[in-house]
């Protein structure tokens, strides 16, 4: 349930700080600062994601920034912390951070695609979950921006439809519009 998930997340964050506190003292401030900024960015990205659920006018640039904050910065932070602790030059650590951001963006965009077109046995979760829950994904934002008037009205009708009994029909109809 949601309360257990929140408590588990809080516990993992505290444990992560405990482990980070064991770093060499000469690297500790830089590592803790980066980790703290990253944790705050992830929260900001999650807030954007929740805000986007109430909007049908999310721009692609807003979406990319949301997934950068929600997903990419975690991978970027991990790579940069590894570089810092290994004693890499700042330029290399920053390049690894940027690489992590880009890999994180690619991961999330691929996840959006696989949620529509993937094989649930390979993907590890049901296909169409983002459509069913009206997640503002790259696929939906792109479809809304390229749709003609008729297609846009149909997409908006399906987005407004919260009838769980129509879920599979909704997934099929929205997927057809993506195609």
Where are these regions (language model features)?
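All-alpha prenyltransferase/terpene-synthase fold signal
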Residues: 1-179
């Amino acid at each position: 349930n949601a309360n257990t998930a929140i408590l588990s997340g809080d516990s993992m964050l505290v444990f992560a700080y405990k482990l980070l506190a064991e770093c060499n003292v000469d690297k500790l401030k830089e590592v803790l600062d980066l980790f703290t900024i990253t944790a705050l960015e992830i929260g900001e990205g999650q807030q954007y994601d929740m805000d986007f659920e109430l909007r049908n006018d999310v721009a692609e640039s807003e979406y990319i920034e949301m997934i950068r904050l929600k997903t990419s910065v975690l991978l970027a932070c991990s790579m940069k912390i590894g570089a810092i602790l290994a004693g890499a030059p700042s330029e290399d650590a920053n390049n690894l951070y940027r690489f992590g951001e880009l890999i994180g963006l690619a991961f999330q965009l691929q996840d959006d695609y696989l949620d529509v077109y993937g094989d649930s046995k390979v993907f590890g979760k049901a296909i169409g979950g983002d459509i069913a829950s009206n997640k503002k994904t790259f696929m939906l934002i792109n479809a809304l921006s390229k749709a003609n008037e008729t297609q846009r009205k149909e997409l908006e009708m399906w987005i407004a439809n919260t009838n769980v009994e129509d879920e599979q029909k909704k997934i099929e109809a929205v997927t057809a519009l993506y195609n």
